[in-house]
Amino acid sequence: MILHAQAKHGKPGLPWLVFLHGFSGDCHEWQEVGEAFADYSRLYVDLPGHGGSAAISVDGFDDVTDLLRKTLVSYNILDFWLVGYSLGGRVAMMAACQGLAGLCGVIVEGGHPGLQNAEQRAERQRSDRQWAQRFCTEPLTAVFADWYQQPVFASLNDDQRRELVALRSNNNGATLAAMLEATSLAVQPDLRANLSARTFAFYYLCGERDSKFRALAAELAADCHVIPRAGHNAHRENPAGVIASLAQILRF
């Protein structure tokens, strides 16, 4: 079994760019940014429980890494960068730390490196279980209306929230809930030490209005790019700013 994805082919000799979306997104999420890099072959992946991979269930990050590895092999992708937002960034960091043949580097936008104590994990597990229950039992428009009121999305205006609620409500609530719990921060290890000892290139992007993830970025041994005029979802709020940062990274 492999993950559903959309592949766009560029010039031979350059590494692939493999894009991983955030929670409740899909393979279209990164395309406005990714299509600015037409010289590179691009793979836009649907993570388990999302989009064309909605029917694929996983028990945890090991399963996601295994599926990602098999998907890369199926497309004969030998050299690549992982580019991930939020959940996709956490998947990218986990997979990279577990080891992926051909990995050139990881570019993470607003991805959490992991909670650092049992109390934080227990609180996150309670929270994610409550959200998962709502995703399973309530209309998605109502759930996402509350989801986007969370502090991490404070930089969004009302129009942006309405647009995101309408877009995300096309998902399957049950499969979102399953993926939310399988890849919860409550079950993700703290990756800070692994990332410090990494053998791959590692870059971190965060919006200038995203104070939580700017603080997290400062804890990581990564080259950090702050995206102007953006909050947590920087590639959506300022795609040109993210394109500029990716172009700078990929020139090295």
From Swiss-Prot:
InterPro entries the record matches: AB_hydrolase_1, AB_hydrolase_fold, SHCHC_synthase_MenH
Keyword Lyase in annotation: yes
Any one GO molecular function term: 2-succinyl-6-hydroxy-2,4-cyclohexadiene-1-carboxylate synthase activity
Metabolic or biological pathway: Quinol/quinone metabolism; 1,4-dihydroxy-2-naphthoate biosynthesis; 1,4-dihydroxy-2-naphthoate from chorismate: step 3/7; Quinol/quinone metabolism; menaquinone biosynthesis
Family under the similarity heading: Belongs to the AB hydrolase superfamily. MenH family.
SUPFAM superfamilies, per database record: alpha/beta-Hydrolases
Catalytic reaction equation(s): 5-enolpyruvoyl-6-hydroxy-2-succinyl-cyclohex-3-ene-1-carboxylate = (1R,6R)-6-hydroxy-2-succinyl-cyclohexa-2,4-diene-1-carboxylate + pyruvate
Gene coding for it: menH
Pfam family, one: Abhydrolase_6
Quaternary structure and interacting proteins, as annotated: Monomer.
Alphabetical UniProt keywords: Lyase, Menaquinone biosynthesis
Protein name: 2-succinyl-6-hydroxy-2,4-cyclohexadiene-1-carboxylate synthase
PANTHER family per the UniProt record, alphabetical: 2-SUCCINYL-5-ENOLPYRUVYL-6-HYDROXY-3-CYCLOHEXENE-1-CARBOXYLATE SYNTHASE, PROTEIN PHYLLO, CHLOROPLASTIC
HAMAP family: MenH
Domain of life of the source: Bacteria
GO BP: menaquinone biosynthetic process
NCBIfam families: menH_SHCHC, PRK11126.1
Function field: Catalyzes a proton abstraction reaction that results in 2,5-elimination of pyruvate from 2-succinyl-5-enolpyruvyl-6-hydroxy-3-cyclohexene-1-carboxylate (SEPHCHC) and the formation of 2-succinyl-6-hydroxy-2,4-cyclohexadiene-1-carboxylate (SHCHC).
